[in-house]
A protein has these predicted regions:
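Single conserved hydrophobic/aromatic residue that forms the stacking wall/gate
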Residues: 1-8, 13
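Short coil/turn segments at secondary-structure junctions
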Residues: 3, 89-92, 96, 133, ...
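Anaerobic metallocofactor- and corrinoid-dependent redox/one-carbon enzyme cores
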Residues: 10, 15-16, 25-26, 51, ...
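Alpha/propeptide regions of enzymes that mature by internal proteolysis
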Residues: 10, 14-23, 28-115, 124-126, ...
Length: 366
């Protein structure tokens, strides 16, 4: 939890003590109600199990709600990868904990360096899709291009995750029509109505915070308008399943939905915890958000944003708006970039060191 974050960051960042190790700041883990604590443990266990990770050093203070034994049990239920534990209150304080954690991490990095790269079929790929800082070009170009890429992943036998439940509101009926069966159909309506209910319970309306000021400045006027653009990221494939926040997503599942908030770092965290190896993230206004574990490919449909934020954006879908390329061509180009990224090519967010992450709470935010 947050009291133990310094040890992880010291292990990874100060003087670059362990090349190849990453950490993340966990704001949760203590003083949480049971559902929130479950979210926290699901995210941490999912991170440890993600295919991009070789092994995990779990650091705790020792007195938090998310006790070490609970976290370790959650991780071991998902994976048998190397796992070490450090409890600050039991090893002699922060400096001693850093020393021990660094030693464990260096041992894991040495072991991981002995592994050989292997080829895997596209059917093993799990791609998470996200949008943030949207403007009208997101719904017109960037998200349709992501949707075309998503359809290609599904056609190859892989898995694509559509997220951000708050941005299904007003378009949930369109998604529900694509459900593979009644159970999935009903779950789509369930998660959207539950999301709105979280706000009604405290006397709020989800539309008071969504669209955001940036969305409105870009030209989006209503939540329904934003939702109609958001769901384009799911392409045209049937929807095969609806997963709860941060739960393990099986490979070769086709198009699935994960119940996440619209908050970008918290939504991306859930998909990575679910097993996504790569995130594809559209932003009409421009966003620097990355992730410590999974590379984030940034897409914009706005050529002005692409020029203004070239340091942050990997792929421009604006040619669709100007009739220079078809959505199918852009989908193929984007899939090629995703494959290159999965093979090790750095994204702009990785190169700049953006590693934002957050964990949702049971009373969801916009």
């Amino acid at each position: 939890e947050i009291c133990a974050c310094l040890v992880g960051s010291e292990m990874c960042i100060r003087d670059r003590q362990v090349e190849g190790a990453v950490s993340f700041n966990n704001q949760q883990g203590c003083s949480q109600v049971a559902p929130d604590q479950q979210f926290t443990m699901d995210v941490m266990a999912g991170y440890a199990a993600n295919p991009n990770i070789y092994g995990t050093v779990v650091v705790s203070l020792g007195c938090e709600n998310c006790q070490m034994d609970l976290v370790v049990k959650a991780i071991e239920e998902r994976t048998n990868k190397p796992l070490k534990q450090v409890i600050i209150q039991e090893v002699g304080g922060t400096l001693k904990a850093v020393e021990i954690a660094v030693r464990y991490a260096k041992e894991m990095v040495a072991e991981a360096s002995m592994l050989q790269k292997e080829e895997f079929p596209l059917s093993e790929l799990i791609v998470g899709t996200e949008c943030g800082g949207s403007d009208p070009t997101s719904g017109l170009a960037a998200n349709p291009a992501i949707g075309a890429m998503s359809d290609l992943v599904v056609q190859a036998g892989g898995t694509s995750i559509l997220s951000e439940t708050s941005e299904f509101i007003g378009a949930e009926h369109i998604l529900a029509r694509r459900a593979i069966n009644k159970e999935v159909h009903d779950r789509i309506y369930e998660i959207t109505s539950r999301f709105e209910a979280h706000f009604h319970a405290v006397g709020e309306d989800v539309r008071q915070g969504n669209p955001s000021p940036g969305n409105k400045a870009g030209g989006i006027t209503t939540l329904e308008e934003k939702s109609l653009g958001c769901i384009h990221k799911g392409g045209h494939s049937p929807i095969n399943a609806v997963y709860d926040y941060a739960k393990q997503v099986e490979s070769k599942q086709g198009l699935v939905i994960m119940d996440t908030p619209g908050n970008d770092p918290a939504s991306v965290a859930a998909m990575v915890a679910g097993g996504a190896q790569v995130i594809v993230f559209s932003s009409g206004r421009g966003s620097p958000v990355g992730h410590p574990i999974a590379p984030v490919v940034k897409v914009t449909g706005n050529k002005i944003t692409f020029a203004n934020m070239e340091d942050n954006i990997d792929f421009c879908a604006a040619p669709l708006i100007y009739g220079e390329k078809t959505v199918e061509q852009l989908g193929t180009d984007l899939l090629n970039m995703v494959v290159e990224t999965a093979c090790g090519k750095q994204t702009k967010a990785e190169a700049l060191g953006f590693v934002e992450t957050a964990i949702a709470r049971i009373c969801n935010y916009v």
